[in-house]
Amino acid sequence: MSELKDYHILHFVDKFENVIVKVPPTVSLDSIARMYGLGITKFHLSNTLPMTDHNGDGYGISGKRLKDQILPFVESVASFFKLRNTPVSIIAGGGIYKAKDVEDYYNAGATDYSLSTIFFTPWKVPEVLDTIKYINRQ
């Protein structure tokens, strides 16, 4: 996989008003801080965990199995920026299937939420959306 270079980030920040970088938990806080220094203020932490199979081919894990890995990552990134009094948007995704999942991500420092797999069980969606609306009113 090719590495994202600073000039790639600068190009997108200059060209587009809203740039959101999707960051898996394998990326270091130093790399995230570097992206912030280049103008990125919105981070999607992350609805996929990159993996490699026995052939060396890449794929991603998503869904419920991610929450245990993404939740501490959200907390770490949120704390990093909070300690520096630096406002960022943190979009949490991965394993959001019920209101408690949204609350957990909110308490970890998420400002927004990415929903995907939950739409395969549409009867669960209203409760989750109601929780997001409630949190956003606070």
Task: Map each language-model feature to its residues.
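Catalytic cores of alpha/beta
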Residues: 26-39, 79-84, 90-113
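Short, flexible coil/linker elements and helix-boundary hinge sites characteristic
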Residues: 8, 17, 82-85, 137
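Glycine-rich phosphate-binding active-site loops on the catalytic face of alpha/beta enzymes
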Residues: 42-51, 96, 102-129
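Glycine/Thr-rich beta-alpha phosphate-binding loop at enzyme active sites
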Residues: 1-5, 30-88, 125-128
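Glycine- and other small-residue-rich loops at beta-strand/loop junctions that grip anionic moieties
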Residues: 2, 21-24, 62-66, 91-95, ...
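Conserved beta-alpha-beta core of the PfkB/ribokinase-like small-molecule kinase fold
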Residues: 1-30
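Extended, intrinsically disordered, low-complexity segments
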Residues: 130-138
